[in-house]
């Protein structure tokens, strides 16, 4: 038998075995509190809290399996917020995706996207938000948005690209404008409000606080793969300013920077 075929079969059998093991755990857990099938009340008439399902380890699952659980509506039951999965870019860089919330984002048809991920690290290279010192047009017209969704996305492994769903985002159009724009992309950069839960330097109204960042003692700062602390972009144009975008300083504090400066990029995506 061809070695590649053998390896593929072995991997498939391994996935099947893990799925069966998990299903056995679910059945065992649910059997601990038998309930009436119609009203969910136990035969003895007492009300019990349904047991929490055991969680699957994200890194043990393929992207196809993760997407399957997402589409089944069970993602928040079988995976844990904060769990991570590694993936390798086409240049050999290993990155880590973290679950930052469930059922938080939507697509342009207003369908709920079950899982939102964000990279734990920033990309190796730094990027300008725009080649010019302006924020006019906001994230919608930014160079970084084009780079992420034309170049960086092509560096993702094919199995990950296949399951990513375009996500709808509302963002200020910058340039001292009070207007907002809508974008729908596979990859995006988080807004100030999605990270800090409020407007600090931004216009506000750009999404809602992600569950991961809402937790106490969450680290807001990020590092590159070599451990170097990195200043990173947010997609939010700075309020009352035509030149700056918001960002997160290497210490984790809210900050801002000129649009033509080169800074780190941590991106989000939905499955």
Residue map of PLM features:
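Heptad-repeat coiled-coil/leucine-zipper oligomerization helices
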Residues: 5, 12-15, 19-22, 26, ...
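Short, intrinsically disordered, low-complexity terminal segments
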Residues: 7-8, 40
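Exposed, low-complexity/repetitive linear segments and helix-based recognition motifs
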Residues: 9-14, 22, 115-118, 250
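A recurrent domain-boundary module in secreted/ectodomain proteins
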Residues: 26-27, 271
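Secretory-pathway extracellular proteins and peptide precursors enriched for disulfide-bonded cysteines
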Residues: 28-31, 257-259
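Collagenous Gly-X-Y triple-helix signature in extracellular proteins
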Residues: 36-271
């Amino acid at each position: 038998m061809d070695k590649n075929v053998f390896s593929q079969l072995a991997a498939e059998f391994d996935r099947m075995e893990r799925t069966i093991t998990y299903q056995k755990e679910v059945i065992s857990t649910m059997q601990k509190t038998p309930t009436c099938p119609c009203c969910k009340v136990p035969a003895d008439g007492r009300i019990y809290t349904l047991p929490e399902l055991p969680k699957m380890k994200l890194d043990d699952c393929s992207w196809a399996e993760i997407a399957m659980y997402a589409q089944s509506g069970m993602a928040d039951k079988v995976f844990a917020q904060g769990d991570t999965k590694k993936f390798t870019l086409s240049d050999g860089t290993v990155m880590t995706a973290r679950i930052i919330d469930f059922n938080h984002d939507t697509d342009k048809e207003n369908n709920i996207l079950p899982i939102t991920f964000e990279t734990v690290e920033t990309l190796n290279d730094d990027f300008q938000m725009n080649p010019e010192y302006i924020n006019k047009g906001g994230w919608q017209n930014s160079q970084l948005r084009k780079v992420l969704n034309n170049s960086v996305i092509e560096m993702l492994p094919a199995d990950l690209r296949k399951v990513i769903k375009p996500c709808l985002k509302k963002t200020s159009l910058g340039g001292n404008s009070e207007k907002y724009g809508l974008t729908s992309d596979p990859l995006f950069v988080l807004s100030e409000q999605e990270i800090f839960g409020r407007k600090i330097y931004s216009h506000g109204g750009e999404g809602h606080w992600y569950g991961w960042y809402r937790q106490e003692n969450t680290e807001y700062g990020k590092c590159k793969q070599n451990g170097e602390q990195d200043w990173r972009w947010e997609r939010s144009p700075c309020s009352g300013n035509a030149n700056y975008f918001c960002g997160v300083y290497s210490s984790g504090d809210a900050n801002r920077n000129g649009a033509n400066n080169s800074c780190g990029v941590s991106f989000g995506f939905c499955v």
